[in-house]
């Protein structure tokens, strides 16, 4: 299962509204292994500090797509899984 083009476009639109300068898909959707219960894993970079406001973007994407979303910032990536995540990345918005 993949994200449809219109779903990716909705994510990009939400990123723009929430000061996200980079967004990439990783995990089961990026590997085309997602099923009906899979969440959407997104690696993001904010253009300015957000505090806990980053949750607004996650909730907005969840509401729009009807699926749980995990937003992870580049700075919060564990060194133990960083390479695993980076090899799956599908950039949706912005530049690495």
Question: Where are each of the predicted segments found?
Answer:
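Short beta-strand->loop micro-motif that forms the acidic, two-metal-ion catalytic signature
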Residues: 41-44
């Amino acid at each position: 299962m993949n994200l449809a083009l219109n779903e990716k476009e909705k994510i990009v639109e939400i990123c723009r509204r929430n000061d996200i300068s980079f967004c990439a898909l990783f995990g089961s959707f990026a590997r085309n292994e997602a099923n009906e219960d899979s969440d959407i894993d997104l690696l993001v970079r904010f253009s300015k500090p957000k505090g806990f406001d980053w949750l607004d973007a996650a909730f907005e994407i969840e509401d729009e797509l009807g699926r749980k979303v995990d937003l992870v910032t580049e700075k919060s990536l564990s060194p133990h899984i960083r390479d695993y995540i980076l090899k799956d990345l599908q950039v949706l918005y912005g530049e690495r």
